[in-house]
């Protein structure tokens, strides 16, 4: 077992993967139906031919650029175990920063709270918000029917109540009324930068990555619509790319939102911008 892990780690290091040992352990645990701790507790357990074949297949796919989360079929986000595959963007810790800001913004809200997650993908944000605020009505939109199928599967598996709506950005929210909180982790990578991304990131849906010429195309549209979507004192909170926070702040101000705030992620990057309807800057 240890020899297998050492061999795989060396292969992954040579290939330039960011977390070679962790990737090797996660794939081995999956292939051998063990926890990572059990890999070391039973390091001398012989491996069957079928186990080794399964593991080699996972290693080959990882070396070809397939993300670990897709190989495992799930990813943890906010202590929720979410199903993921190539239909959806893989939830990232950066988006937990968006969730923290969103929860802070509605901390004093009571019954009747209405929340929308625009561009939900796997459903990560909507489901985490439904978990943290079970009294709220939570809606989630996505233009991709494949992504919505995955989000619905996650909601059913976790037993969380979210209303999923198919359509472009906020378009399907019209009949749902106005909201106290809108969150969105929209594509924010400039189109010209997509081909230069790491292979595993390029394996994710381009629809979930490509934010147009400057990365802000979809955010501009949502921000422009926000005043009609938000309740008085309602909040819009957006995840943004590195160096985009200032531009997004100006978009929110231009739409008449105030109480603009930026929140940094664990790496110190300004990752979230939020603003409130009907307040001065």
Regions found by a protein language model. Name each.
Residues 1-20:
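Non-catalytic nucleic-acid substrate-recognition regions in nucleic-acid-modifying enzymes
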Residues 12, 106, 155, 226, ...:
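Conserved hydrophobic residues forming the short capping helix/wall of the S-adenosyl-L-methionine
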Residues 21, 26-105:
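Conserved AdoMet
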Residues 27, 65, 95, 125, ...:
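Residue-level signal for inorganic ion chemistry
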Residues 97-200:
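Conserved SAM/SAH cofactor-binding pocket of Class I
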Residues 141-148, 199-231, 235, 241-243:
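Glycine-rich S-adenosyl-L-methionine
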Residues 242-255:
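Short alpha-helix
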Residues 253-281:
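Core SAM-dependent methyltransferase catalytic element
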């Amino acid at each position: 077992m240890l020899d297998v892990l050492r061999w795989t780690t060396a292969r992954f290091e040579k290939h330039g993967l960011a977390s070679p040992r962790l990737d090797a352990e996660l794939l081995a645990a999956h292939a051998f139906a063990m926890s990572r701790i059990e890999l070391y507790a039973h390091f001398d357990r012989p491996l069957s031919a079928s186990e080794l074949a399964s593991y080699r297949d996972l290693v080959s796919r990882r070396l070809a650029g397939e993300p670990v989360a897709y190989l495992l079929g799930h990813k943890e986000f906010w202590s929720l175990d979410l199903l993921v595959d190539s239909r959806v963007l893989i939830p990232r810790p950066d988006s937990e920063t968006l969730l923290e800001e969103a929860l802070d913004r509605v901390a004093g809200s009571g019954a009747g709270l209405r929340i929308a997650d625009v561009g939900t993908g796997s459903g990560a944000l909507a489901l985490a918000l439904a978990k943290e605020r079970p009294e709220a009505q939570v809606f989630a939109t996505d233009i991709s029917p494949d992504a919505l199928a995955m989000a619905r599967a996650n909601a059913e598996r976790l037993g969380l109540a979210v209303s999923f709506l198919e359509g472009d950005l906020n378009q399907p929210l019209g009949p749902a009324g106005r909201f106290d909180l809108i969150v969105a982790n929209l594509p924010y990578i400039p189109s010209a930068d997509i081909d230069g991304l790491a292979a595993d990131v390029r394996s994710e849906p381009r629809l979930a990555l490509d934010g147009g010429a400057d990365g802000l195309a979809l955010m501009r549209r949502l921000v422009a619509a926000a005043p009609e979507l938000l309740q008085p004192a309602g909040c819009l909170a957006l995840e943004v790319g590195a160096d985009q926070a200032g531009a997004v702040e100006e978009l929110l101000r231009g739409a008449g939102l105030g109480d603009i705030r930026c929140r940094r992620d664990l790496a110190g990057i300004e990752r979230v911008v939020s603003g409130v309807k009907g307040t001065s800057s």
